[in-house]
Amino acid sequence: AIMKYGVGVKCATITPNAARVDEYGLKKQWASPNGTIRGILDGTVFRAPILVNNVHPFVRTWTKPIHIGRHAYGDVYMNREIKVPGPGTGELVFTPRGGGEPIRKVIQEFESSGVLQGIHNTVPSIRSFAAACFTYAMDQTIDLWFSTKDTISKIYDAEFRRIFEEEYEANWKEKFEEAGIEYFFTLIDDAVARIMKSEGGMLWACKNYDGDVMSDMLASANGSLAMMTSVLVSPHGYFEYEAAHGTVQKHYYKHLEGETTSTNSMALIFAWTGCLKKRAELDETPEVGEFAKKIEEASIETVESGAMPGDLMRVADPDPKNRQVSTEEFIDCIREKLEEKL
């Protein structure tokens, strides 16, 4: 549907473990739906915090939003794994198409049982990731940080670094200098340390797994996993908007038992408004974009008025008007704010 219409919204999905296979009667432990979709669409996931004036970052130095650019293709999300049964040789083999001598590397001489994993990426996908990140940083007028571990991964991670530097020198260096922003590379562990001491205000470009982990850390440090926007920008012109969190399983089970839940729907609301704004841009229907903007404003104003779900209630600035509302009450409060704007 996204490939047909160009824009879509994806709700949270389950990547089943053994318990979920039994619970839902699945045929097997299916692969990650996100990984499958991103493998088809390719591209980069951009995430940014949803800011409200009564919830502040836990990191005191962060005075500007930190954006994440996560490569959405390959690596561990499209891996192949082997459970090694016993002693033997684990090899990495590449067989050229159309003939030629295979390239072989011994990974490990196993003396016992163990595990093996193969991952991959492609130069075109890495290049589109780099181009998307430079474009995003230029559009937002913010610095671009990129981090890998090329001191350890001297071919795999080093290829990412090489392509980013090549893209910067060939297409972006002069533009960045004119805009007063910079491209900065450092190792992933050093980047984490620097981020924690920074004032924010940059796009942090990460490989797939790094971006998966760090985007959740940033969202939580800004108040909640539900306080972050997320959009997959495909090099083929597709846009997939989603909530950056999971299925909120514990809340769902409470709901099934008839208990009242207080679930934060901000990320899902902003997924839909982001989609509507992109649809308005493509269809040249500005009134649709204005409607989406008013929904976002109503959502933020609701939280700032003191009506908020439990996750924000625990981290919001103390105020007598603060009150925890249920899942449905929160949506009703947003609706009331929206109706005032229409």
Q: Positions of the model-derived regions?
A:
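Glycine-rich phosphate/diphosphate-binding loop of Rossmann-like nucleotide-binding domains
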Residues: 92-186
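Short acidic loop-to-helix transition motifs that present clustered carboxylates
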Residues: 186-193
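Glycine-rich phosphate/pyrophosphate-binding loop and the adjoining helix
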Residues: 72-74, 78-130, 285, 293-342
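N-terminal glycine-rich phosphate/adenylate-binding segment common to multiple enzyme folds
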Residues: 1-102, 209-213
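Flexible, glycine/charged-enriched surface loops at secondary-structure junctions
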Residues: 139-148, 172-185, 280-292, 302-315
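Glycine-rich phosphate/nucleotide-binding loop
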Residues: 195-294, 298-305
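Short glycine/threonine-rich loop-to-helix capping motif typified by GTGT followed
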Residues: 154-165, 195-203, 209, 219, ...
